[in-house]
Amino acid sequence: ARGANGVIIVTTKSGSEGKTQVNFNASLGYKKVSKLVKTMSPYDYAYYQYELGSTDYGNYNDLDIWKSIEGRDYQDEVFGRTGNQKQYNVNVSGGTKDLKYNIGFSHNDEKSIMQGSGYAKNNVNAKINANLNKWLSLDFNGRMAFTKLDGLNGGADTNESSAANSVVANTVRWNPVEPLSGTSDDDEENSTSTRRNPTERITDTYKYQERFQQNYNVGLNWKPFKNITFRSEFGYGWKYNNTDQVWGSNATTNSKYGYNGQPQVQFVRLENKNWRNANTLTYDNKKLFHGRDHINVLVGQEWSSSQDVTRTNTSVAFPTSFTLNEVLANTAAGTALPNEGNIKAEENILSYFGRINYTLNDKYLATFTLR
């Protein structure tokens, strides 16, 4: 890999010679918010509004009524549930002197503390090392990962015209009780006449993500002479990130797309393809000057290519009576905005590199790198 300090070699877990071994691990955990941010009581909030000159919560003589009113704790409503996490892992390894393998599968499943949020992830890893003869060896490693995410995952709501109006921020900022008049003279960001409380917004928002990634690498090592090794490796990767999101009428009161109060839907498709080829020649002599010194010289070249593709489809102005499922099932019932697409130019890199390590008497080390 490219690095500021030269060539960096990254290795993964390999198999070992011996009988086939199967290992299985499982764990279960629970999570819950340990401490919430302290917010105003209904009385404190009503009194604060009165001091600001608002009469939406009654006259001064009526403010004591709010002492007996139980306000809503939006932090508890949004983050109050008990989450859990389950993990499973199975690994198979073994091999002979000339063939070693290591294959693993893991599954993570989480119900998050945030209402409507969670994820599931599956990973498959494989690594194989084979000695074809005394001059040639082959190694292969592959990895596949598939992830499903539900919910806003931290409160991000890309439909909002202002990031400050996120669900997370408003669990702390939102008024604990509604004004007597049903409307409020608060600032626009917290105005109940144009906004919806965090619980309404999160229950009227649907977000589902799928992420898939696969990477494969194969390498061939050839040792034609003593102390000299030639290695050629090739890697290929492909991944996508798909997001489906629907905002119901309670989640579009401050939409950046306009059409406030009308359901909206957006589909985002991200894709990346990449490949890499590297060829290196290494000279390694541990018995230089009758074993006093050790020299390692590596030269090589690498080229790689990567390309990103993004597509976004958005539809707005669905009937206000539509539920989230009805929007997903009838996307043609809305008004389609112009499609957004971006096919980036391929990013191609060709490079040459070299490294020299010289050890003197196992005490002094000199290193030279160039790329």
Mark where each language-model region is.
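Repeated loop/turn-to-beta-strand initiation elements of outer-membrane beta-barrel proteins
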Residues: 98-101, 135-138, 227-230, 289, ...
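Transmembrane beta-strand segments that form the barrel wall of outer-membrane beta-barrel proteins
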Residues: 26, 105-111, 366-371
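Periplasmic N-terminal accessory/gating domains of Gram-negative outer-membrane beta-barrel systems
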Residues: 1-6, 30, 71-83
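Residues on the lipid-exposed face of transmembrane beta-strands in outer-membrane beta-barrel proteins
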Residues: 12, 90-94, 126-130, 218-222, ...
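Exposed, low-structure sequence patches enriched in small/polar residues
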Residues: 233, 300, 349, 353-359, ...
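Outer-membrane beta-barrel channels and translocator barrels
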Residues: 17, 85, 96-97, 133, ...
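A beta-strand signature from Gram-negative outer-membrane beta-barrel systems
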Residues: 1-25, 85-87, 100, 106-108
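Surface-exposed loop/interface segments of Gram-negative outer-membrane beta-barrel transport/assembly proteins
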Residues: 17-72, 112-117, 123, 127-215, ...
